[in-house]
């Protein structure tokens, strides 16, 4: 900041010197304003008058040392030690600045007159008369007061007001102002004072014994004491005299007596105890009682004065937790007290040694001592021959420079005169490049002779010892150590090994490898060592025998330090880790090093757990004898080679990694299965693995990657087979026309129960009549699939790759030897090229089709390469030398050639690294070229739950070649590529500006008629791709699918308004999308996102800069318990003020433009104009396309203009639009999910997170069906509903898969601007008949009641029938002083996104709560494939899954799904508070928690378009949750309230009154205006343009509370 101000001033001064008069005036004004501001800022600092005469240099010293004050130097008073005396005033004011004004303060040995003059009536001075000097000083202070009062009296003036209270107190109660007792014995009373007490000690703690200081402070209940004292580092040496040059003072030491005086002055000396001062310097804590201590902390050093503070600490606040398992409460409390006492004592002892053990602290507080060492000097008396020794401080660098040089002298040259000559030369000058320069070592010249003697003696001694060592130990080929051991061996014979070990352990003989150890005395000691030794000599250290505990603690500390390099190492529980090491008898340091080596992949072992928690560490370290059931077992025993067919029949097909109790890979070489057909009729259970996260990989990294690739095939096969088995179990005997990505064939009837979208499937899962499930390889004839007699049903899938996975597994299994893959020795070269750099062209130019092999990921790429290679008419590229990766793996060994000279892999970085290693090995090549792009989309693991560690993603290569010239990309895209790649990226394209973007008003506006798209159509997500295909666009692909392809023109489309994680500035998907075209790219998007920002930046790049990228040709190239409090809200009644215009203004500021819409006839316009709709399979009754005319009664007209719409009339078109935009518009985002197994894991997390531990098991003693439960359900129903059940006999069930469909007539208002561009669809209601509800309603009502009773209600709120007051009570114990992250998960299309996985999760929860199996199966079939009928509109259709909005489980089902979703993604064990309601959620986490990629997890596992918000205040169910220091208050959303005041469906005045009462109920809390400011902040988080709204809140209260006034918000529509 200072540099900026200097630069600005310099620039202004240069401007002033210019010739432009106008600019000069402006610059002068600016300089003047700056000077005024600076002087005003200085005037605001405390003012101190410095009356004593000081020199200019001393003036600068005082000013720099105390920048907090504005010091005025008058130089009007000559005095002894004038600088030190003036600094005393500054030091006093500095200490008083640290104390809150008005707090009772004890000035130990202070100047009471100074406090009186400053008007400090709250200071008590303890001024004991310890010597004559003290008496004289006290009398002088009294004289100064008398002198001051006499001057006032002589001038007929009164004591100023700010001093009046202090002087009156001194006149009436002088003992309250000053006493003459020592601070330890002071009798000052604090009866009327209740606040915190402080103390200051200005140059007075010298005379207070350090051992009594803490107790004295506690006796006065002092909170913090600030002190200042003089000290010098040189006092720790043997010097008896030390100067303090800045204040012209000195210390003289004689034994324990330390005298302080000012040089050249006759003032009295001050004598103190040296050991006592040393305690204040070195000690950290000062005990005050058996509970409390005062901890010292240095603050600053200024002008030879050290400032520090002593803070009061209550040691009872140490955490008293101790692990215990048992029922003896007395034993438990005793153990807890013992552990706490040890922890307190250890903490205090450690704090005592902070300064002594921390060299950096010593260097900081003794800056002059850094890199200085203490060297002894020797002398001898000529008369008595008595030798003397003293010490001096010398630069360590100087010492070693001399020693290293003179050690090179020959024996004759090693003389004292030569040493002295060299020392003198380097002290006087040094020669640099022939020029004499000043020496860098400022050593006192008077010491050079003595230092030279020390260096000479030390070197002489070292030379003699070397000669002695050589003469003593030249014993032939054997060393002395070997001779010694030979003698011992002859003496003890066969017992020698144990004798040798005992001798070494008892340290009777000490060896270091092959030489005896000889110790040489140190030349010097460091200042830090001397400080420690001086302190220990002067102070009696407290003795506490904690050596064993300290050693254990040190070992654990070192182990945890070793573990601290790991990610998320802060999650370690030290106690659990310690217990684990003790129980397994593992050395903590060894365990830590093993864990670090494993996690950093330095050990040849990979553990696939994500976080190094204590449980995972224990699991990884325990041996086979102590392993529990299901844990990992690492052994080295021989294992029989298992039979693959036998394993599958028993359901034991195993992973390549270490899983369960299998110690090695089970894919050993076996001749049993030689063809893929032998997989036919393998049991499905043999291919399904429920736990793939407990895998351990061993060996080099390439071997681990290859094992992981095999396991990924097993995992993909497992998930696909598991899902088809589930489909077979869930499919009912029905025949519907809807086509799906999977199919189910009924063998007996030869009918498709579920028709697949594809044909001629190569494999499937067969269900036999015995209800057994097998994987079958399918054959076809003209009638369809050829089946066997014992087959009941066949399930097929067009998505999964089980057939190819089986073939790959067969091939790879044959390559393994003893369960281990072989790694090729071929050279691997990575060719890293930018997009369009001509990788394929380069491959074709380098390949020799006679002896090389080209492998590509996709079939289209292989055909393209063959076509280009054979373009000349000569067939050189065939299916033998240009193949896809899958074809090569599946058909390995079937071709004519098995060995190739060179291997070329195109887009190799999109493959699994283990797959690349296998390809190199299988090709038997000498060199492999892997072409790829390190910045584009890498291999993506799409199997949920399967581990793919981060370091596995890095391909090990021998050489890297780069290609940085793109032949495809235009210049503007090349500009973007330069930001992503190392090195300069150039282009050959003549196109400069090629990218553009267009914001579309909504997803519905993109259709082939109104928006034809140019060129290749790309999307980011599969859901957007399916949406464009359904609207009639052709040839649509995702960005990931076209990586490596080239197109002239590209249209990139985004229809998803919610955040997509792959659309980011540094995302590889964005890079691929921008680099597919050669001429143009246009991006169509419904929202602003990072890609729009990138394109806009590229559009602004000048053509001049783009020319720089052009080239003509390619170049070569621990648990804490916080206080719990509960309080009530402060209530301040809100004034009833404001007008209608206030509400309108506020609404327009928050949602600009919404109030100007004329949407009363939007529904009529849609009916009368042509409309094009993309409809899925459904049946329409066109006879109901024209609704019967109805008389429309006039409604009340609102005075507040909002975006509210008129009620709509039910009809075919209106209902169909609602169905298309809601039920037919479900996203498809999820990846490969093993539904049943993953659902089971999710439900485990749900029960562990939310339910009380004692209620996690279902209560088998109660019945779900009872008269009471039915009566409770009936009591909640309307009379009309009960009447519909009059003819129901409850004997048989109606069709549970048949639903009715209807719409809500009133559109839901959105609090955003979408109404301006979209026609809002009505909300749909899909519901069962009341007969089905009568059966399942009481059932699920009881299950819900049991679930809510089991929830941990202290932390979780499942918002069912809760009032706002109950919400406030739940959140009322949030501590606003604790930093928290407030999280909200917002999910778009929540009901329609729910698929088979969500149903499986919900059914598993109900099953564990006690739902009967038969009814559970009935309910499941009623929600799988369902038929919707809308009798009013004449629409019939079929839906798979989705949440039914009128179901008996709609609300509670949505609630448990959102809770399960969050429990599977977030660390709920850390959660403070959480609330769930339908699709709404609100979570409070401690500040700083780490969260996973929520969007990716929600997409791939839960099929949710979700975004996670971090906020300051929560928003829950249309209400703002405001937590504050007294509790919590819940405010209804005021903007939502205003929006409702614009309602256009109010029938009459009675209806309006009912409407007002309902609004009053929900907005009751707005009557309390105490927290309007926090409400403004909360609203501002959601609506960025919202102004402070207290005026509109009061206006709402005014109108809602007055029945007559509320009527003025509406006009009678019949009279208009």
UniProtKB/Swiss-Prot annotation:
<keyword id="KW-0941">Suppressor of RNA silencing</keyword>
<dbReference type="Pfam" id="PF01660">
    <property type="entry name" value="Vmethyltransf"/>
</dbReference>
<dbReference type="GO" id="GO:0003968">
    <property type="term" value="F:RNA-directed RNA polymerase activity"/>
</dbReference>
<dbReference type="GO" id="GO:0005524">
    <property type="term" value="F:ATP binding"/>
</dbReference>
<dbReference type="InterPro" id="IPR047310">
    <property type="entry name" value="Virgaviridae_RdRp"/>
</dbReference>
<feature type="domain" description="Alphavirus-like MT">
    <location>
        <begin position="72"/>
        <end position="281"/>
    </location>
</feature>
<keyword id="KW-0696">RNA-directed RNA polymerase</keyword>
<dbReference type="GO" id="GO:0039694">
    <property type="term" value="P:viral RNA genome replication"/>
</dbReference>
<keyword id="KW-1090">Inhibition of host innate immune response by virus</keyword>
<feature type="region of interest" description="Methyltransferase">
    <location>
        <begin position="50"/>
        <end position="458"/>
    </location>
</feature>
<feature type="domain" description="(+)RNA virus helicase C-terminal">
    <location>
        <begin position="964"/>
        <end position="1116"/>
    </location>
</feature>
<feature type="binding site">
    <location>
        <begin position="833"/>
        <end position="840"/>
    </location>
    <ligand>
        <name>ATP</name>
    </ligand>
</feature>
<keyword id="KW-0378">Hydrolase</keyword>
<feature type="domain" description="RdRp catalytic">
    <location>
        <begin position="1380"/>
        <end position="1493"/>
    </location>
</feature>
<dbReference type="GO" id="GO:0052170">
    <property type="term" value="P:symbiont-mediated suppression of host innate immune response"/>
</dbReference>
<dbReference type="InterPro" id="IPR027351">
    <property type="entry name" value="(+)RNA_virus_helicase_core_dom"/>
</dbReference>
<keyword id="KW-0067">ATP-binding</keyword>
<dbReference type="InterPro" id="IPR001788">
    <property type="entry name" value="RNA-dep_RNA_pol_alsuvir"/>
</dbReference>
<keyword id="KW-0547">Nucleotide-binding</keyword>
<keyword id="KW-0945">Host-virus interaction</keyword>
<dbReference type="InterPro" id="IPR007094">
    <property type="entry name" value="RNA-dir_pol_PSvirus"/>
</dbReference>
<keyword id="KW-0347">Helicase</keyword>
<dbReference type="GO" id="GO:0003723">
    <property type="term" value="F:RNA binding"/>
</dbReference>
<dbReference type="GO" id="GO:0006351">
    <property type="term" value="P:DNA-templated transcription"/>
</dbReference>
<keyword id="KW-0693">Viral RNA replication</keyword>
<dbReference type="InterPro" id="IPR043502">
    <property type="entry name" value="DNA/RNA_pol_sf"/>
</dbReference>
<dbReference type="GO" id="GO:0008174">
    <property type="term" value="F:mRNA methyltransferase activity"/>
</dbReference>
<feature type="region of interest" description="Helicase">
    <location>
        <begin position="830"/>
        <end position="1085"/>
    </location>
</feature>
<keyword id="KW-1159">RNA suppression of termination</keyword>
<dbReference type="InterPro" id="IPR027417">
    <property type="entry name" value="P-loop_NTPase"/>
</dbReference>
<dbReference type="Pfam" id="PF01443">
    <property type="entry name" value="Viral_helicase1"/>
</dbReference>
<dbReference type="GO" id="GO:0006396">
    <property type="term" value="P:RNA processing"/>
</dbReference>
<dbReference type="GO" id="GO:0016556">
    <property type="term" value="P:mRNA modification"/>
</dbReference>
<comment type="subunit">
    <text>Heterodimer of a large and a small subunit.</text>
</comment>
<dbReference type="Pfam" id="PF00978">
    <property type="entry name" value="RdRP_2"/>
</dbReference>
<keyword id="KW-0548">Nucleotidyltransferase</keyword>
<keyword id="KW-0808">Transferase</keyword>
<dbReference type="GO" id="GO:0016887">
    <property type="term" value="F:ATP hydrolysis activity"/>
</dbReference>
<comment type="similarity">
    <text>Belongs to the ssRNA positive-strand viruses RNA-directed RNA polymerase family.</text>
</comment>
<dbReference type="GO" id="GO:0003724">
    <property type="term" value="F:RNA helicase activity"/>
</dbReference>
<dbReference type="InterPro" id="IPR002588">
    <property type="entry name" value="Alphavirus-like_MT_dom"/>
</dbReference>
<feature type="domain" description="(+)RNA virus helicase ATP-binding">
    <location>
        <begin position="801"/>
        <end position="963"/>
    </location>
</feature>
């Amino acid at each position: 900041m200072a540099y900026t101000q200097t630069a600005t001033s310099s620039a202004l001064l240069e401007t002033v010197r210019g010739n432009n008069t106008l600019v000069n005036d402006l610059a002068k004004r600016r300089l003047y304003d700056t000077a005024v501001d600076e002087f005003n800022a200085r005037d605001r600092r405390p003012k101190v008058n410095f009356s004593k005469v000081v020199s200019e240099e001393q003036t600068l010293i005082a000013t720099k040392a105390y920048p907090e004050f504005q010091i005025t130097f008058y130089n009007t008073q000559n005095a002894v030690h004038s600088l030190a005396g003036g600094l005393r005033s500054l030091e006093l004011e500095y200490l008083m600045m640290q104390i809150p004004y008005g707090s009772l303060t004890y000035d130990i040995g202070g100047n009471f007159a100074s406090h009186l003059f400053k008007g400090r009536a709250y200071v008590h001075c303890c001024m004991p008369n310890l010597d004559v000097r003290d008496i004289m000083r006290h009398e002088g202070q009294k004289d100064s007061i008398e002198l001051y009062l006499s001057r006032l009296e002589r001038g007929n003036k009164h004591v100023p007001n700010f001093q009046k209270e202090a002087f009156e107190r001194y006149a009436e109660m002088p003992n309250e102002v000053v006493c003459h007792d020592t601070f330890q014995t002071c009798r000052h009373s604090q009866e009327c004072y209740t606040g915190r007490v402080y103390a200051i000690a200005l140059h007075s703690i010298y005379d207070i014994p350090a051992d009594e200081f803490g107790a004295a402070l506690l006796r006065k209940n002092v909170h913090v004491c600030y002190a200042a004292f003089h000290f010098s580092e040189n006092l720790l040496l043997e010097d008896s005299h030390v100067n303090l040059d800045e204040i012209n003072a000195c210390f003289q030491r004689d034994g324990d007596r330390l005298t302080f005086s000012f040089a050249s002055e006759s003032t009295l000396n001050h004598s103190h105890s040296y050991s006592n001062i040393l305690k204040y310097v070195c000690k950290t804590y000062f005990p005050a009682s058996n509970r409390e201590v005062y901890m010292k902390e240095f603050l600053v050093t200024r002008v030879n004065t050290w400032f520090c503070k002593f803070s009061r600490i209550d040691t009872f606040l140490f955490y008293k937790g101790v692990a215990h398992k048992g029922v003896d409460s007395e034993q438990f409390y005793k153990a807890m007290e013992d552990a706490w006492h040890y922890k307190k004592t250890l903490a205090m002892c450690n704090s005592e040694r902070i300064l002594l053990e921390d060299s950096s602290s010593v260097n900081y507080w003794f800056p002059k001592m850094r890199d200085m060492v203490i060297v002894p000097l020797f002398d001898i008396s000529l008369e008595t021959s008595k030798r003397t020794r003293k010490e001096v401080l010398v630069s360590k660098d100087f010492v070693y420079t001399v020693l290293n040089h003179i050690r090179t002298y020959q024996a004759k040259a090693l003389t004292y005169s030569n040493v002295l000559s060299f020392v003198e030369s380097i002290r006087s000058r040094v020669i640099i490049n022939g020029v004499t320069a000043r020496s860098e070592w400022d050593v006192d010249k008077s010491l050079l002779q003595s230092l030279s003697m020390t260096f000479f003696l030390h070197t002489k001694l070292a030379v003699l010892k070397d000669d002695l060592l050589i003469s003593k130990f030249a014993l032939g080929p054997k060393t002395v150590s070997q001779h010694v051991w030979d003698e011992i061996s002859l003496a003890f014979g066969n017992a020698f090994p144990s004798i040798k070990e005992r001798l070494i352990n008892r340290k009777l003989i000490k060896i270091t490898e092959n030489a005896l150890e000889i110790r040489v005395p140190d030349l010097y000691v460091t200042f830090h060592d001397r400080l420690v030794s001086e302190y220990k000599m002067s102070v009696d250290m407290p003795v506490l025998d904690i050596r064993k505990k300290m050693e254990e603690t040190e070992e654990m500390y070192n182990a945890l330090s070793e573990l601290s390099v790991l990610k998320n190492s802060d999650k370690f529980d030290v106690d659990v880790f310690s217990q684990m090491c003790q129980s397994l008898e593992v050395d903590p340091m060894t365990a830590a090093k093993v864990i670090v080596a494993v996690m950093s992949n330095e050990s040849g072992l990979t553990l696939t757990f994500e976080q190094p928690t204590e449980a995972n560490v224990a699991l990884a370290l325990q041996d086979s004898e102590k392993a529990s059931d299901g844990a990992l077992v690492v052994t080295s025993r021989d294992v029989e080679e298992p039979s693959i067919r036998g394993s599958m029949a028993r359901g034991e097909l195993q992973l390549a990694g270490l899983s369960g109790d299998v110690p090695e890979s089970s894919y050993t070489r076996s001749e049993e299965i030689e063809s893929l057909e032998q997989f036919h009729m393998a049991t499905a259970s043999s291919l399904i693995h429920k736990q793939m996260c407990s895998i351990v990989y061993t060996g080099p990294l390439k071997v681990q990657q290859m094992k992981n690739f095999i396991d990924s095939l097993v995992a993909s096969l497992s998930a696909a087979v598991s899902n088809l088995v589930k489909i077979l179990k869930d499919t009912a005997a029905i025949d519907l026309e809807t086509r799906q990505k999977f199919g189910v064939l009924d063998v007996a009837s030869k009918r498709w129960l579920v028709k697949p979208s594809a044909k001629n499937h190569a494999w499937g899962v067969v269900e036999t009549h015995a209800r057994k499930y097998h994987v079958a390889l399918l054959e076809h004839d003209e009638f369809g699939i050829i089946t066997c007699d014992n087959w009941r049903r066949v399930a097929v899938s067009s998505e999964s790759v089980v057939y190819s996975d089986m073939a790959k597994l067969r091939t790879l299994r044959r390559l393994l030897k003893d369960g281990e893959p072989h790694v090729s020795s071929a050279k691997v070269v990575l060719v890293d090229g930018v997009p369009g750099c001509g990788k394929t062209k380069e491959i074709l130019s380098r390949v020799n089709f006679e002896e090389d092999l080209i492998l590509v990921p996709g079939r289209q790429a292989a055909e393209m390469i063959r076509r280009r290679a054979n373009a000349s008419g000569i067939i050189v590229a065939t299916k033998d030398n240009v193949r896809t990766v899958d074809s090569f793996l599946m058909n390995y060994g079937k071709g004519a050639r098995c060995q190739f000279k060179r291997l070329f892999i195109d887009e190799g970085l999109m493959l699994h690294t283990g797959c690349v290693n296998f390809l190199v090995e299988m090709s038997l090549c000498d060199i492999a070229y892997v072409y790829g792009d390190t910045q584009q989309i890498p291999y993506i693991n799409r199997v949920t739950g399967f581990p793919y560690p981060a370091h596995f993603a890095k391909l090990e290569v021998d050489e890297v070649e780069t290609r940085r010239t793109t032949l495809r990309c235009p210049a503007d895209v090349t500009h973007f590529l330069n930001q992503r790649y190392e090195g300069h990226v150039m282009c050959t394209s003549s196109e400069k500006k090629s990218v553009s973007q267009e914001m579309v008003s909504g997803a519905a506006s993109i259709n082939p008629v109104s928006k034809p798209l140019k060129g290749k159509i790309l999307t980011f997500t599969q859901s957007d791709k399916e949406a464009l295909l359904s609207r009639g666009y052709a040839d649509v692909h995702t960005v990931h699918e076209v990586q490596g392809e080239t197109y002239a023109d590209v249209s990139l489309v985004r229809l998803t308004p919610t955040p997509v994680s792959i659309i980011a500035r540094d995302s590889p998907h964005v890079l691929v999308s921008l680099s597919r075209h050669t001429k143009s790219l246009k991006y169509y998007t419904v929202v602003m996102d990072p890609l729009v920002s990138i394109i806009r930046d590229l559009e602004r790049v000048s053509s001049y800069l783009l020319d720089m990228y052009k080239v003509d040709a390619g170049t070569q190239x621990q648990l804490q318990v916080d206080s719990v409090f509960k309080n009530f809200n402060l209530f301040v009644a809100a004034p009833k003020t404001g007008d209608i215009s206030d509400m309108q203004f506020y609404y327009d500021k928050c949602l600009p433009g919404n109030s100007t819409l004329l949407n009363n006839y939007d529904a009529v316009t849609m009916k009368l104009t042509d409309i094009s709709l993309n409809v899925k399979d459904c049946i329409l009754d066109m006879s109901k396309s024209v609704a019967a005319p109805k008389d429309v009664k006039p409604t009340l007209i609102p005075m507040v203009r909002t975006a509210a719409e008129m009620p709509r009339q039910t009809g075919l078109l209106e209902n169909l639009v609602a169905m298309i935009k809601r039920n037919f518009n479900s996203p498809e985002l999820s990846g490969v999910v093993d539904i049943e197994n993953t659902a089971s894991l999710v439900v485990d997390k749900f029960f562990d997170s939310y339910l009380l531990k004692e209620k996690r098991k279902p209560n088998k003693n109660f019945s779900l069906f009872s008269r009471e439960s039915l009566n409770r359900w009936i009591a909640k129903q309307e009379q009309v509903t009960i009447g519909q059940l009059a003819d129901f006999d409850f004997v048989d069930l109606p069709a549970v898969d048949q639903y009715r469909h209807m719409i809500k007539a009133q559109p839901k208002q959105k609090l955003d601007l979408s109404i301006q561009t979209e026609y809002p669809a009505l909300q749909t209601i899909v519901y069962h008949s009341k007969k089905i509800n009568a059966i399942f309603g009481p059932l699920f009502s009881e299950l819900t009641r049991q679930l809510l009773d089991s929830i941990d209600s202290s932390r979780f709120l499942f918002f069912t029938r809760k009032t706002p007051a109950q919400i406030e009570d739940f959140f009322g114990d949030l501590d606003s002083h604790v930093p928290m992250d407030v999280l909200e998960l917002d999910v778009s299309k929540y009901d329609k996104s729910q698929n088979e996985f969500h149903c499986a999760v919900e059914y598993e929860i109900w099953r564990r709560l006690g739902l009967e199996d038969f009814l559970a199966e009935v309910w499941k079939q009623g929600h799988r494939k369902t038929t919707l009928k809308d009798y009013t509109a004449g629409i019939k259709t079929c839906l798979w899954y989705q949440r039914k909005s009128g179901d008996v489980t709609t609300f509670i089902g949505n609630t448990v799904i959102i809770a399960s979703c969050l429990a599977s993604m977030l660390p709920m064990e850390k959660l403070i508070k959480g609330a769930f309601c339908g699709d709404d959620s609100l979570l409070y986490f401690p500040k700083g928690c780490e969260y996973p990629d929520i969007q990716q997890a929600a997409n791939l596992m839960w099929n949710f378009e979700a975004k996670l918000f971090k906020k300051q205040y929560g928003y829950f169910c249309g209400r703002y949750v405001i937590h504050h220091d007294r509790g919590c208050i819940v405010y209804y959303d005021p903007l939502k309230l205003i929006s409702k005041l614009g309602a256009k469906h109010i029938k009459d005045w009675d209806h309006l009154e009912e409407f007002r009462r309902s609004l009053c109920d929900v907005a009751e809390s707005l009557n309390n205006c105490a927290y309007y400011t926090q409400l403004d902040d909360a609203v501002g988080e959601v609506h960025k343009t919202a102004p402070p709204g207290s005026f509109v809140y009061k206006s709402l209260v005014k109108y809602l509370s007055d029945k007559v006034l509320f009527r003025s918000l509406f006009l009678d529509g019949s009279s208009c």
